[in-house]
Amino acid sequence: MAPKKKVSALLKLQIQAGKANPAPPLGPALGSHGVNIMDFCKQYNAATQDKMGQVIPVEITVYEDRSFTFILKTPPAAALLKKAAGIQKGTENPLTHKVGSVTKAQVREIAEIKMADLSARDVEAGMKIIAGTARSMGITVTD
């Protein structure tokens, strides 16, 4: 068995799918750890070309020999909720100002998409997490 590589950094970034480029903020974040920025951009864009227009979180593991691996996550719940509710952004005051609404079916659909990244045991628990995110954004959940 080959010896394990030593990890030098773990970066968590949210990048627009298919639009990774060496410009800030991505370039400086990767460059400071010695990663080949263009190589990462090409690999990330190729991996996310089918998800254009979405923000895809990525976890980049940088090793001491300057090589890297990355894991793509599911889009943020807030982004999926904004898309489902048809709004540009959430509210500053979710208690008094509601900006949109989503149905329980839409919440279930989002929870099923996010299940891999949620710390929930089943879809019902995942729905509660997504509904809580919706409430904090000023989005009401209707039957």
Swiss-Prot record:
Single annotated GO MF: large ribosomal subunit rRNA binding
Family under the similarity heading: Belongs to the universal ribosomal protein uL11 family.
Keyword terms: Methylation, Ribonucleoprotein, Ribosomal protein, RNA-binding, rRNA-binding
The UniProt record lists the keyword Thylakoid: no
GO BP of this protein: translation
SUPFAM superfamilies reported for this sequence: Ribosomal L11/L12e N-terminal domain, Ribosomal protein L11, C-terminal domain
One Pfam family of this chain: Ribosomal_L11_N
Assembly, per entry: Part of the ribosomal stalk of the 50S ribosomal subunit. Interacts with L10 and the large rRNA to form the base of the stalk. L10 forms an elongated spine to which L12 dimers bind in a sequential fashion forming a multimeric L10(L12)X complex.
GO terms under cellular component: cytosolic large ribosomal subunit
Keyword Acetylation: no
Natural source organism: Bifidobacterium adolescentis (strain ATCC 15703 / DSM 20083 / NCTC 11814 / E194a)
Posttranslational modification: One or more lysine residues are methylated.
SMART domains linked to this entry: RL11
Function: Forms part of the ribosomal stalk which helps the ribosome interact with GTP-bound translation factors.
UniProt name for this protein: Large ribosomal subunit protein uL11
